């Protein structure tokens, strides 16, 4: 059951951002073409767009360099953010107490594959 179209991915690990905030951006670009996703990431007002844009460009560069694929024919097949390690800090409070602060990290994974001919006909 091997798929004939190669799937190329890129991973950014230990990004100092909550995976919940990154998933909000990834949900918007999943299933879109590379050009559409870049335009969306350029104009969305979220800080998570910058690391996602870097991972997307890396995945497309991997596809272009390693597999010889054309960036115009690529679609985002997978995009997800897994939780990374949590940095634990403490905030001093009144009367000798301390409240925990959890600085979350995430691992961003984006996979691209060539668009199918049937999908290309419906997209045009």
Curated annotation (Swiss-Prot):
Family, similarity comment: Belongs to the universal ribosomal protein uL22 family.
Function, as annotated: This protein binds specifically to 23S rRNA; its binding is stimulated by other ribosomal proteins, e.g. L4, L17, and L20. It is important during the early stages of 50S assembly. It makes multiple contacts with different domains of the 23S rRNA in the assembled 50S subunit and ribosome. The globular domain of the protein is located near the polypeptide exit tunnel on the outside of the subunit, while an extended beta-hairpin is found that lines the wall of the exit tunnel in the center of the 70S ribosome.
Cited InterPro entries: Ribosomal_uL22, Ribosomal_uL22_bac/chlpt-type, Ribosomal_uL22_bac/org-type, Ribosomal_uL22_CS, Ribosomal_uL22_sf
Gene3D superfamilies, per the entry: Ribosomal protein L22/L17 (3.90.470.10)
Pfam families noted in UniProt: Ribosomal_L22
Listed name of the protein: Large ribosomal subunit protein uL22
Keywords: Ribonucleoprotein, Ribosomal protein, RNA-binding, rRNA-binding
Taxonomy, superkingdom: Bacteria
GO BP annotation list: translation
Keyword presence, RNA-binding: yes
Entry's Gene Ontology cellular component terms: cytosolic large ribosomal subunit
UniProt organism field: Synechococcus sp. (strain JA-2-3B'a(2-13)) (Cyanobacteria bacterium Yellowstone B-Prime)
Entry GO MF terms: rRNA binding; structural constituent of ribosome
PROSITE patterns per UniProt: RIBOSOMAL_L22
HAMAP family linked: Ribosomal_uL22_B (MF_01331_B)
């Amino acid at each position: 059951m091997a798929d004939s179209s190669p799937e190329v991915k890129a991973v950014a690990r230990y990004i100092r951002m909550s995976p919940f905030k990154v998933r909000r951006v990834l949900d918007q670009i999943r299933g879109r073409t590379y050009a559409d996703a870049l335009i969306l990431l350029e104009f969305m007002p979220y800080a998570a767009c910058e690391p996602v844009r870097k991972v997307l460009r890396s995945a497309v560069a991997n596809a272009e360099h390693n597999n010889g694929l054309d960036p115009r024919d690529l679609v985002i097949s997978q995009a997800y953010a897994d939780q990374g390690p949590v940095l634990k800090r403490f905030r001093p409070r009144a009367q000798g107490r301390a409240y925990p602060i959890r600085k979350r990290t995430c691992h961003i994974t984006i996979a691209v594959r060539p668009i199918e001919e049937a999908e290309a006909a419906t997209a045009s």
